């Protein structure tokens, strides 16, 4: 009985696929851009490259208890398995790499094991570069 049902299912599957023909006279699809029919006429020059502070120089903090700013790019990968910041800033590599070691407030033992609450560095620490044009107006005041 199983063989007959299996054979019938195969015949129906093949029969269902074999009688169809591909549509050869398909009409082209006209997709419009979000910009409509307007052409791009204004080509602007590329943005200036950001200038980071000199190596080994700490950036001045704007307010008390502000996390230190990162004086370099901050696109190092941070995943559950690996923290890219620790390739330079871990306690055992910081002196050799001439980098600031992870603060004692961020570790849980004398070996420099990072506390899980401080694992994702870019939650608090941000890269700072001297960009020529501000992206948004800044009304911050230290007073």
Swiss-Prot record:
* Record-linked Gene3D superfamilies: Flavocytochrome C3, Chain A
One matching Pfam family, short form? NapB
Could you say which residues bind heme c 2 here?
106, 121, 124-125
| Electron transport recorded as keyword | yes
Phenotype upon knockout is: Mutants exhibit 15% slower rate of nitrate reduction compared to mutants for other genes in the NAP operon. Mutants can grow on nitrate to maximum cell density earlier than wild-type. Nitrite is not detected in mutant strains but ammonium reaches detectable levels sooner than in wild-type and accumulates to same level as in wild-type. Double mutants with deletions of both NapA and NapB fail to grow on nitrate or reduce nitrate under anaerobic conditions. Double mutants for both NapB and NrfA reduces nitrate as fast as wild-type.
Where in the cell does this protein reside?
Answer: Periplasm
Q: Which PROSITE patterns match?
A: PROKAR_LIPOPROTEIN
Positions bound to heme c 1: 72, 85, 88-89
Q: What induces the gene encoding this protein?
A: By nitrate or fumarate under anaerobic conditions.
State its role.
Electron transfer subunit of the periplasmic nitrate reductase complex NapAB. Receives electrons from the membrane-anchored tetraheme c-type CymA protein and transfers these to NapA subunit, thus allowing electron flow between membrane and periplasm. Not essential for nitrate reduction but confers advantage to the organism when grown on nitrate and thereby a fitness gain in utilizing nitrate.
Which species is listed as the source? Shewanella oneidensis (strain ATCC 700550 / JCM 31522 / CIP 106686 / LMG 19005 / NCIMB 14063 / MR-1)
Q: Which SUPFAM superfamilies match?
A: Multiheme cytochromes
Tell me what this protein is called.
Periplasmic nitrate reductase, electron transfer subunit
Provide this UniProt record's keywords sorted from A to Z: Electron transport, Heme, Iron, Metal-binding, Periplasm, Signal, Transport
Signal peptide residues on this chain, from the entry's feature table:
1-22
Recorded family membership: Belongs to the NapB family.
Q: What does UniProt give as GO cellular component? A: periplasmic space
Lineage at the top is: Bacteria, Pseudomonadati, Pseudomonadota, Gammaproteobacteria, Alteromonadales
């Amino acid at each position: 009985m199983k063989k007959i049902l299996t054979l019938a299912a195969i015949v129906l599957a093949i029969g269902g696929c074999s009688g169809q023909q591909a549509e050869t006279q398909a009409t082209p699809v006209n997709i419009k851009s979000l910009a409509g029919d307007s052409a791009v006429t204004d080509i602007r020059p590329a943005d200036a490259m950001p200038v980071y502070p000199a190596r080994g120089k700490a950036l001045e903090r704007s307010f008390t208890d502000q996390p230190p700013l990162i004086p370099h790019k901050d696109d190092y990968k941070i995943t559950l398995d690996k923290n890219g910041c620790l390739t330079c800033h871990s306690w055992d590599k910081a002196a050799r790499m001439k980098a600031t070691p992870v603060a004692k407030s961020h570790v849980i033992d004398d070996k420099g094991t990072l506390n899980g609450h401080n694992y994702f560095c870019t939650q608090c620490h941000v890269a700072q570069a001297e960009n020529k044009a501000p992206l948004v107006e800044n009304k911050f005041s230290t007073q």
